[in-house]
Amino acid sequence: MFIIPTLRNLKQMSIRILFVTVFIFSINAFTAEKEMPSTFKDGDPSKGSSLIASCAACHGADGNSISSDWPKLAGQNQRYLLEQLQYFKSGERVNILMSSVLPILNSYTDQDLLDIAAFYSSQIQTNGQAEDDAELLAVGEALYRSGDMKKAIPACTACHSVNGKGNELAGFPSVAGQQKAYLVSTLKAYRSMERDAGDYALVMQAVSQNLSDYEIEALANYMHGLYE
C-alpha cells in the first residue's frame, strides 16, 4: 500500500531537508576552520590606507560609516571584504550606491583590493546600540540564536557565530554592530533574490525566504546591538 504525501507533509519534509543542508554546510565550514590550514594571504594595511579616499566618503576613514544605509567595514574579515570588492568589480554584485566608485574600483588590481580589505579589517569597529524595545529584541534574539524550525529559518549563529563575528576562513561576515538599515536592506535583497553574488548567496536566499518584514527588523536591531 502506497501513502501519497499531503502538501503539508511535503512542506514539512522540505523544511527538514533545508535544516539538514544548512546544518551540514555549517559543520563543514566549522571543520575546515578547525582542521585545515588557511591558504589566505593577508594584505598590507599600510598600502591599503593610501587607496581608500573614494571609500572613506561613505564608509568613513576608519571604516565606521555615519549613515545607517552604508555598512561599517571596520573589523570585517579580509576574505569577505576582498570577495565583495571583487564581485563589485566584476559586475557580479550590483548596488546603485556603489556605482559612482566603480571606475576607481575597476582600476585597482586584486592586490590593491586585498590591501584595502586588510586596512579596513585592521580598524576597530564602533559598537552599535539596539533599539530598547523588549518585544523586538526578544524576537531578534530568538531568531538569531535558535531560528524558527516551523518557518524553515535556521539559527544565524550557525554561520555568523554566537557573538556575531562570523567565520573568517569560510568568508562568513561579521554582523555584530553592523548598521541596522544596511542589515535590513541586505536581508530584503537576499529575500527577493536581488542579491545573488557568490556561492553563499544561495544559503542566504534560502534562509531569508520566510522572514517577515518585522522579523527582518528584529534581527537587524539585535545584530546592530551585538558586541563583545
PLM region spans:
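N-terminal secretory signal peptides that target proteins for export/translocation
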Residues: 1-13
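Sec-dependent signal peptide recognition
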Residues: 12-20
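N-terminal signal peptide c-region/cleavage motif recognized by signal peptidases
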Residues: 26-28
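Electrostatic cytochrome c docking/interface patches
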Residues: 30-52, 69, 122-149
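The feature marks the first
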Residues: 35-92
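Sequence context surrounding c-type heme c attachment/ligation sites in exported
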Residues: 46-56, 78, 82, 146-157, ...
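The canonical Cys-X-X-Cys-His
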Residues: 48, 55-61, 116, 153-162, ...
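Axial heme c-ligation environment in periplasmic c-type cytochrome domains
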Residues: 66-72, 88-132, 169-174, 192-218, ...
